[in-house]
C-alpha cells in the first residue's frame, strides 16, 4: 500500500509520518518511510541543489524539472520495488506537492501540463491513500519559524501559502476516495490517533 503525506508548512507531516512508521513496525507490518525530494542517493543530491539557499537564480521551470527527476528515481529505485515486495510505503510529499506548490502556488504553469509531466516522471503511479495534514496558514508558518532549518523553498509570502493550502483542499475535494483531510490544529497524539485509524481501516479493506 502506497500512502503519501501532504500539506503546507507547519502541518507536522514529517513527525506524524515517523510516528506512524514506528507504530506499524511495532505491529509487525513491513513498512518503509521515504521523502521527496530525495529518498535515493541520486535524489538526495538533487534535493541539495533544490533547497540550497545560494541558488537564488533557480527558475521555477528548472525547479519543476529537478523535482520530477528526483521523483522518477524514487519511484523506480524504491517505491515500486517495495510495493512489489508487499511493504507499506509512506512518503513525505509526492506528486500532489508539485501541483500545490508549483501549480497553485506559482500560478505560472497550467495544471494539465504539470499533470502530464508528473505522469511521465511517475509512470502513472498514484498513491492508494493521501493524508492532507491541514493547518491554518498563519499557525503553520509560526510552527515553521520555530522549527528553524530554513531552505530556499521557505522564501515565500503568506499569500503564496494560502494558494498552496487552497490548492490542496481543492484536490482533496475533487478526489475524496484517495484523500483524507486531517486537522492538525490539535495535540499531536489526537492527530496521530486519527491517522492510525484511517490507515488501519484502509489496510483491512484493501
Regions inferred by a protein language model and the residue ranges of each:
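Hydrophobic positions on the alpha1 helix immediately C-terminal to the Walker A/P-loop
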Residues: 16
